């Protein structure tokens, strides 16, 4: 996504023990930069005293309805955004379904983030496009996302992928003025395919054709 001679390519990967140290470093980077952590699912539980193995288990199990309900959560899958060129974790994205009533109002189907040292390079748009591919696999026709109204970078990311602003209101759970967007999954995957398909790793599970 940068203007250099070597084209960068990306893919989403399920968190694993093999990436333990890298994931811990990724989360710690947010702490060091005093930045909010988004899109990590349960992985950031390591900041609350959980072992990495416990956090990973929770993260991977959240896709199962029975497990999610036990904790009053919605089902979700978390992915690492990997830049293939240097095998580095650039960001994370969490795709959710069977939303709780709370998440239907604020939070929505997708949460994402890019590590502080890799921001302002357009990576979150790639992250969201790949997230929409995963949303389609799950069977979501449209997805809801939100962000603080002051987070102009996130708003621009959502709008760049076809996000339509539905409402702006105060989230009663944190008291922050929040913008809520909706994205039509099939429509956006097709409309913006030419902008992103060449940056997706060729081995990633992606069909380069019209979305149907």
Where are these regions (language model features)?
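GNAT-family acyltransferases
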Residues: 2-109, 178-212
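A short, internal acetyl-CoA/4′-phosphopantetheine-binding micro-motif in the GNAT/acyltransferase core
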Residues: 82, 97, 109-120, 148
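Charged catalytic carboxylate motif
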Residues: 22, 127, 153
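Conserved G/P- and acidic residue-centered "switch" motifs that form tight phosphate/ATP-binding loops
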Residues: 87, 122, 139, 151
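Catalytic cores of nucleotide-sugar-dependent glycosyltransferases that transfer UDP/GDP/TDP-activated
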Residues: 81, 140, 168-171
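Conserved acetyl-CoA-binding loop-helix of GNAT-fold acetyltransferases
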Residues: 111-114, 120-137, 156-160
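Conserved catalytic-core motifs of GNAT/GCN5-like acyltransferases
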Residues: 146-147, 162-179
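Conserved GNAT acetyl-CoA-binding A-motif
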Residues: 135-146
